[in-house]
């Protein structure tokens, strides 16, 4: 007789996970395992970048630092920096009102510099024919007294004369040199002659690549910081073995110090109000540092260092495990785009904890779960390699630093913002589509592995067992634990059990045939009896109708 308890089932792992992922076909699919690839957290601090401290300018601007605003004395000499931090509206900018020519270009230059060495190129004491210490202003106070920018000299007439200046500096250093100078624009003609004696003045500056001639613009202006005059500052990069030549008969703000560019590298000027956090990171944003190996983040579009790519997404989760459908859940699930093919199995097994796919058997010796280690390990390796490949491809060093534009370049700035927004939209779309597609493929990959395991068992057992349609096989022979193990490891001996299985199949077939014969006899008897009863009823009705005249009966011979 058939031993119905001898069964083997193919199934998959389930657990108590509530992790959910999205696919092309479905949203919020619960899976056994998942990996978040979107970093959403930061520490809210400014940190060292790979062990190098940032240059945090506090209340000073880049212009205030480079020119030497008296309120920025703490930055007279600064060590190597990894990046520069400037507040959105620093208080200590150009203390004497005016402009810094090509300021945005200078900031762009600084984004590729990691260290300056300040050197004296024209000593203040060398201006014997001009007043080099009288050029101060109440707009630039220091310790309650009028002062001026530390790194340039405002030259004033001496003894009612302002002799024409002709000075040169030859860059004998091996490094490029950042040189700054300026011009003073008086409020009126009286101020012009009061300071410089000469009513008509000029400043000429020349290098191998620069040819500049400046004249003061005398005009009545509103007061800023108590000053109606204005100052305009300029800069150039002086190459090694090149010379810079100055000529002027008034209004000249001469360089005293210049900056030797001793180290170039990746840097940035970051706008942030944060304080230094005495920490280290590989990726810094204006919102805080990110320490993550994830390929994407949604913290801030501007970054410096080895950073994930910024996307506008709120959620990017990769499926690494299977659909989490414990066996107690009987409702039907939708299947995937690529033909998810393990739908014949009603649910996963929470009792199988040592693998993704495996078996459950039951026989006279008992029952139990066993994972298929080989298929599980291959699947783990495949999914892990895929996830790592995605992360490696996306997690390359990526910097996005802000660009600054002056008031005349607003249209360019707007166009630049639109282009950057467009790039971010494309990155976001690509990242989200990548996750949806890979999640679909991963879940279908798991379904395919379950189906392959099922087919492996089916091809071994052939007609020695019956497919029950729910992922299980019912043996036509007794299958002890040794037999069950042979099915699992692929060494099942079909001929050994085929005779016993054949006899049990025939016994089952005989029972079915005997039952079918009995049903046929009963059916024939029932049909004949019903027909005979109907004939008798019709004959009786006819005789009754003939006897009372309702029906005429004629017999013709």
From Swiss-Prot:
Q: Extracellular side: which ranges?
A: 1-520
Instruction: Note the Gene3D superfamilies from the entry.
Output: 3.90.20.10, 3.90.209.20, Hemagglutinin Chain A, Domain 2
GO MF terms on file? host cell surface receptor binding
The terms describing its cellular component in GO are:
host cell plasma membrane; membrane; viral envelope; virion membrane
Question: What topology does it adopt in the membrane?
Answer: Single-pass type I membrane protein
**First and last residue of the signal peptide:** none
Provide the disulphide bond pattern: 9-472, 47-279, 60-72, 95-140, 283-307, 479-483
Q: Which residues lie on this side of the membrane: Cytoplasmic?
A: 542-557
Q: How is it modified after translation?
A: Palmitoylated. In natural infection, inactive HA is matured into HA1 and HA2 outside the cell by one or more trypsin-like, arginine-specific endoprotease secreted by the bronchial epithelial cells. One identified protease that may be involved in this process is secreted in lungs by club cells.
Q: Which UniProt keywords apply?
A: Clathrin- and caveolin-independent endocytosis of virus by host, Clathrin-mediated endocytosis of virus by host, Disulfide bond, Fusion of virus membrane with host endosomal membrane, Fusion of virus membrane with host membrane, Glycoprotein, Hemagglutinin, Host cell membrane, Host membrane, Host-virus interaction, Lipoprotein, Membrane, Palmitate, Transmembrane, Transmembrane helix, Viral attachment to host cell, Viral envelope protein, Viral penetration into host cytoplasm, Virion, Virus endocytosis by host, Virus entry into host cell
Per the annotation, which location comes first and is thus the protein's main one?
virion
Q: Which domain of life is it from?
A: Viruses
Kindly list the residue ranges recorded as spanning the membrane.
521-541
Q: At which residues is a lipid of type S-palmitoyl cysteine covalently attached?
A: 546, 553, 556
- Give the subcellular location: Virion membrane; Host apical cell membrane
Which parts of the sequence are marked as the site Cleavage? 335-336
Q: Name one GO biological process term.
A: virion attachment to host cell
InterPro entries, A to Z: Capsid_hemagglutn (IPR008980), Hemagglutn_HA1_a/b_dom_sf (IPR013828), Hemagglutn_influenz_A (IPR000149), Hemagglutn_influenz_A/B (IPR001364)
Q: Which Pfam families match?
A: Hemagglutinin
Family stated for the protein in its record: Belongs to the influenza viruses hemagglutinin family.
- Additional remark text: Major glycoprotein, comprises over 80% of the envelope proteins present in virus particle. The extent of infection into host organism is determined by HA. Influenza viruses bud from the apical surface of polarized epithelial cells (e.g. bronchial epithelial cells) into lumen of lungs and are therefore usually pneumotropic. The reason is that HA is cleaved by tryptase clara which is restricted to lungs. However, HAs of H5 and H7 pantropic avian viruses subtypes can be cleaved by furin and subtilisin-type enzymes, allowing the virus to grow in other organs than lungs.
**Role noted for this protein:** Binds to sialic acid-containing receptors on the cell surface, bringing about the attachment of the virus particle to the cell. This attachment induces virion internalization either through clathrin-dependent endocytosis or through clathrin- and caveolin-independent pathway. Plays a major role in the determination of host range restriction and virulence. Class I viral fusion protein. Responsible for penetration of the virus into the cell cytoplasm by mediating the fusion of the membrane of the endocytosed virus particle with the endosomal membrane.
- Quaternary structure, from the entry: Homotrimer of disulfide-linked HA1-HA2.
Q: What is this protein called?
A: Hemagglutinin
Q: What organism does the UniProt record list as the source?
A: Influenza A virus (strain A/Silky Chicken/Hong Kong/SF189/2001 H5N1 genotype A)
Its taxonomic placement starts with: Viruses, Riboviria, Orthornavirae, Negarnaviricota, Polyploviricotina
């Amino acid at each position: 007789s058939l031993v119905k308890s001898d069964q083997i089932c193919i199934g998959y792992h389930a657990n108590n996970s509530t992790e959910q992922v999205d696919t092309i076909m479905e949203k919020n699919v619960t899976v056994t395992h998942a990996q978040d690839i979107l970093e959403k957290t930061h520490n809210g601090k400014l940190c060292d970048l790979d062990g190098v401290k940032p240059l945090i300018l506090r209340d000073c601007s880049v212009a205030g630092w480079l020119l030497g605003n008296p309120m920025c004395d703490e930055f007279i000499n600064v060590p190597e920096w990894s990046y520069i931090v400037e507040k959105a509206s620093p208080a200590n900018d150009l203390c004497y009102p005016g402009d810094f020519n090509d300021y945005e270009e200078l900031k762009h230059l600084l984004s590729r510099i990691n260290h300056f060495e300040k050197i004296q190129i024209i000593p203040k004491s060398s201006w014997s024919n001009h007043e080099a210490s009288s050029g101060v202003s109440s707009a630039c106070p220091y310790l309650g007294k009028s002062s001026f920018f530390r790194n340039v000299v405002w030259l004033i007439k001496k003894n009612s004369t302002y002799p024409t200046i002709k000075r040169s500096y030859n860059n004998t250093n091996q490094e490029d040199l950042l040189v700054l100078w300026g011009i003073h624009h008086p409020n009126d003609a009286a101020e012009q002659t009061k300071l410089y004696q000469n009513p008509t003045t000029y400043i000429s500056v020349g290098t191998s690549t620069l040819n500049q001639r400046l004249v003061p613009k005398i005009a009545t202006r509103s007061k800023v910081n108590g000053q109606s005059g204005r100052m305009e500052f300029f800069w150039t990069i002086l190459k090694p073995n090149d010379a810079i030549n100055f000529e002027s008969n008034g209004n000249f703000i001469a360089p005293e110090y210049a900056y030797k560019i001793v180290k170039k590298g990746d840097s940035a000027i970051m706008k942030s109000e944060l304080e230094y956090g005495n920490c280290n990171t590989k990726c810094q944003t204006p919102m805080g540092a990110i320490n993550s190996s994830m390929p994407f983040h949604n913290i801030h579009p501007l970054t410096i260092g080895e950073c994930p790519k910024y996307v506008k997404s709120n959620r990017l989760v990769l499926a690494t495990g299977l659909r989490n459908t414990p066996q107690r859940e009987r409702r039907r699930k939708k299947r995937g785009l690529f033909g998810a093919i393990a739908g014949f199995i009603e649910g996963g097994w929470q009792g199988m904890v040592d693998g993704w796919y495996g078996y459950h058997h039951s026989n006279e010796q008992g029952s139990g779960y066993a994972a298929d280690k080989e298929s599980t390990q291959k699947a783990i390796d495949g999914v892990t390699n895929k996830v790592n490949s995605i992360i490696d491809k996306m997690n390359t060093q990526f910097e996005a630093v802000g660009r600054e534009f002056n008031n005349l370049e607003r249209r360019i700035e707007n166009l630049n913002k639109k282009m950057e927004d467009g790039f971010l939209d494309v990155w976001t779309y690509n990242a989200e589509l990548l996750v949806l597609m890979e999640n679909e493929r991963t879940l279908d990959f798991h379904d395919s592995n379950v189906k392959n395991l099922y087919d492996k068992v089916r091809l071994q057992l052939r007609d020695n067992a019956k497919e029950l349609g729910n992922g299980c096989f019912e043996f036509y022979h007794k299958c002890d634990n040794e037999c069950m193990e042979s099915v699992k490891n692929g060494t099942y001996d079909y001929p050994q059990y085929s005779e016993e299985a054949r006899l049990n199949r025939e016994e089952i077939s005989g029972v079915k045939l005997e039952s079918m014969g009995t049903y046929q006899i009963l059916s024939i008897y029932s049909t004949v009896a019903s027909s005979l009863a109907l004939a008798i009823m019709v004959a009786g009705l006819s005789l009754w109708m003939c006897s009372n005249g309702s029906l005429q009966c004629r017999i013709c011979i």
